[in-house]
Amino acid sequence: MTTKRIIACLDVKDGNVVKGVNFLNLQLKGDPVSLASLYEEEGADEIVFLDITATIEARKALYNVIKDTASVLSIPLTVGGGIRTPDDVSMALRSGADKVSINTAAVESSQIVKKSAEEFGSQAVVVAIDVKKVSGNWIVFTKSGTYNTRLDAIKWAKKVEELGAGEILLTSIDRDGTRLGYDLELTRKIVDSVNIPVIASGGAGKMEHFYEVFSLAKADAALAAGIFHDGIIKIKDLKSYLSQKGIEVRM
């Protein structure tokens, strides 16, 4: 069995970490540098830093905050938000990111995925896919969950793999912040459709949810935010629990 990864997510707005429900009603949770450092100490395998309003505010990512966050980490850092061109990808990598997450721009011009993978390697390119169920179908939404692209999520996942993405960050908007568990059906369908790693995101509320998304949905990694920010689950305890349940994790 491959080693499963636990990823702590920092949703950043105006330089502060925030968290909401279904991408709405954001509350302040702390500053990214100290939280990133804390989660590494607790045993997180990676940190994802998402500048959640960069795209809808039509501005560049917060490169100074990214630089400060990267400077305290020795685990991989993925950065997303406001990434529109291969130059933005380059800037994020130069600021200290190990991987760059592309979301809205990938839908608007899929060549950014292809060009970035060719220039920086697939291992540096993550495509974030935010999904809502609409009339029984899984549909891709962009612009922080505000815009219905009418793209089928499974077809889009296959397409980004073809374009050279090295990983998919899959978020269920319906489950985001609800703490009701990951969308296992959606995650499994995407995992079965591609040959690149899939990070499950949206809905983690208790340790069992991580076990389910690894054992039933076969996700390669599980991302969470609110339950870590609020101290409901400590990453160290989560990894001990998963290890006892037969899931291979880095201790």
UniProtKB/Swiss-Prot annotation:
GO terms for cellular component: cytoplasm. Keywords: Amino-acid biosynthesis, Cytoplasm, Histidine biosynthesis, Lyase. The active site is at 11, 130. Pathway: Amino-acid biosynthesis; L-histidine biosynthesis; L-histidine from 5-phospho-alpha-D-ribose 1-diphosphate: step 5/9. It catalyses: 5-[(5-phospho-1-deoxy-D-ribulos-1-ylimino)methylamino]-1-(5-phospho-beta-D-ribosyl)imidazole-4-carboxamide + L-glutamine = D-erythro-1-(imidazol-4-yl)glycerol 3-phosphate + 5-amino-1-(5-phospho-beta-D-ribosyl)imidazole-4-carboxamide + L-glutamate + H(+). It is an enzyme of class 4 (lyase). Heterodimer of HisH and HisF. This is Imidazole glycerol phosphate synthase subunit HisF.
